[in-house]
Amino acid sequence: MILIRKIYRKIKSFLKVNWIKTIYINFKMLSFEQARRLPIVIFGKCSIQSLSGKIIFRSPVEFGMLGLGQRYEVFSKESGKAELNIQGKLIINSKAQFGYDYKIFIDKNAILTLGNMSSMASQAKIICTQNITLGDFCRLGSECQIIDTNFHNLKNVKTHEVFNKSNDIWLGGFNFISNRVSVLGKTVTSDYCIVASNTLLNKDYSSFGENIILGGIPAKLVKENIVRDWETEKENLENYLTIKL
């Protein structure tokens, strides 16, 4: 009976993978030596708009380093709206995950860097037109969006100052960012930062230091000397989120 259950789980996990698009993206974007290991795994439906850019791994390549549409949350039913558009560079330091129904856009000449065990949960949205970096174990909840541009040119009508349309984003390591958080251009967070749900990040918060909670629209310092218990969770997260078929 135990053996049957194990076989059933293996088959179920195998069938969740979109093998056609998994094979396609690996052999389209990587060298043969890297691609044959299938470091990128696509789960479920995914509309691939463009793969004209580059995907770069900064650690030894192995199976399942980047999970796209990976099921690791309480809810696991997708609506099939995942979308991938890579015209710039996607740099992956080690393992990273996106939940189901993600939308990723990397513009020409833009760079999106994902730290080890960084992730965005279901219905995540990234629009990268310049430079976005997620540190190691930077983890964002469902329905978060990271957008480094306002899409339109703005200027001061009195001084005629023209504002940058796009600005870099840096999210530090071991950040715990709750659901429905919006991260906009100019955002910088320190390591070991917690962000409350429904928060708007839009500036440099690094002067507040580490072990803090940010919250509000726009975000402000809510509490100090608070940290997620990463020492307890770190190993469990790596074991739970590593893709095994």
Language-model regions, residue ranges each:
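Domain-scale signature associated with acetyltransferase and cell-envelope carbohydrate enzymes
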Residues: 1-147, 168-174, 181, 187, ...
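Histidine-centered active-site/metal-ligand motif
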Residues: 152
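Flexible, solvent-exposed loop segments that connect beta-strands
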Residues: 155-162
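Short, local alpha-helical segments
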Residues: 158, 176-178
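Conserved beta-strand->loop/alpha-helix structural units within folded catalytic cores of enzymes
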Residues: 178-179, 197-198
